[in-house]
A protein has these predicted regions:
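Catalytic alpha/beta active-site cores
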Residues: 1-294, 299-300, 318-332
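Extended amphipathic alpha-helical segments enriched in small hydrophobics
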Residues: 300-308
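Cysteine-centered nucleophilic/redox motifs
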Residues: 315
């Protein structure tokens, strides 16, 4: 099969299926200079006269790059990426009290924001109540203070949790905050199986890059795999972890090291879940990632593409995952 054959097959299957579900936002996409941006570019073998001249198979091209929406997802997990749907837009926000942060969230949603991203203060991040002496001077400083279910109710007052997705940047006490969130949603009358959002829940990068851990590694990993198991059965649309390279890069790593350490952490989480008795395809589709977007554009593009391909191959070949959703590296 030639590269052209592969390209046409992609258009007739993967792309068509995607467009049948989500039409592109407009008929023509252009740069600021008015130059049309093609849906997909492939090598031109006919001196500028287009891809129809390609008649020789290029297995290396297909195996390494392929087409968006298909294994190994080097060029993206969605066939049209953001030509059909925008990413969820949410400003990282949270400060002072739950009541004050709630006002901010409702304002942001009224301005067109399509999701919420909760910033917690340091006492909350390391499991201290606001009235603990060690928390003095830090309550509500770099995020919102949450000590109780009442605080969580105030945080999401008048915000229907079954209609908005919520990202919570919380790690060591992630299970507690997620339980509070689900409880508030239930009190609102929501079905927890329909809830959408993300908890960061990446304790390994806290040990090496950031520092807001509470427990030793082994029990911390147990908490994380318990969350994997619970959510796979009860909250299937929730991203149970955001495996983070961002903080590793900010702590001084290179782009290559960022990908290496992040994927190593991802492998550790998958291995822990398998050791706990979970089936890989039951939880892998709920794993997400968080990478840095640094200054060198081409290096960052290459980093993202390499990470997608490596993760897809790790999940399919090393862990024998069968579902395409288990192979896809979804990140922000």
């Amino acid at each position: 099969m030639t590269l052209l054959d592969q390209f046409n097959k992609w258009k007739e299957t993967t792309l068509k299926k995607s467009l049948d579900k989500f039409k592109e936002r407009k008929g023509r996409f252009e740069t600021s200079a008015g130059i049309e941006v093609p849906r997909l570019a492939i090598p031109d073998g006919n001196e500028g006269r287009g891809p129809l001249a390609l008649t020789v198979a290029d297995e290396n091209y297909v195996n390494k790059l392929g087409f968006p929406g298909e294994f190994p997802y080097t060029r993206g997990v969605q066939p049209t990426m953001y030509r059909s749907r925008f990413w969820t837009m949410r400003q990282y926000a949270g400060f002072s009290t739950a009541e004050e942060s709630n006002k901010r969230y409702r304002y942001l949603l009224a301005q067109g924001q399509t999701g919420l991203s909760v910033a917690f203060d340091l006492p909350t991040q390391i499991g201290y109540d606001a009235d603990d002496p060690i928390a003095q001077g830090e309550v509500g400083k770099v995020g919102v203070s949450i000590s109780s279910i009442k605080d969580m109710e105030q945080l999401f007052d008048q915000i229907p949790l079954d209609k908005v997705s919520t990202s919570m940047t919380i790690n060591a006490p992630a299970g507690v905050l997620l339980a509070m969130y689900i409880a508030v949603a239930k009190r609102q009358g929501a079905d927890m199986r329909e809830l959408r959002g993300t908890i960061q829940n990446d304790i390994l990068k806290e040990y090496v890059a950031r520092g807001t851990y509470i427990f030793p590694p082994a029990p911390s990993m147990r908490l994380i795999t318990d969350i994997f198991q619970f959510c796979s059965k009860e909250v299937p649309y929730w991203n149970t972890i955001s495996i983070s390279g961002y903080h590793i890069r900010e702590a001084g790593s290179t782009a290559v090291q960022e990908v290496a350490f992040t994927l190593a952490n991802g492998i550790a989480y998958v291995e822990a879940a398998l050791k706990a008795g979970l089936n890989v395809d039951d939880f892998a589709g709920q794993l997400s990632f968080f990478f840095n977007a640094h200054n060198n554009l081409l290096e960052e593009v290459a980093k993202f593409r390499a990470a997608r391909r490596m993760w897809a191959k790790i999940m399919r070949e090393r862990f024998k995952a069968q579902k395409p959703s288990s192979w896809q590296l979804r990140f922000h």
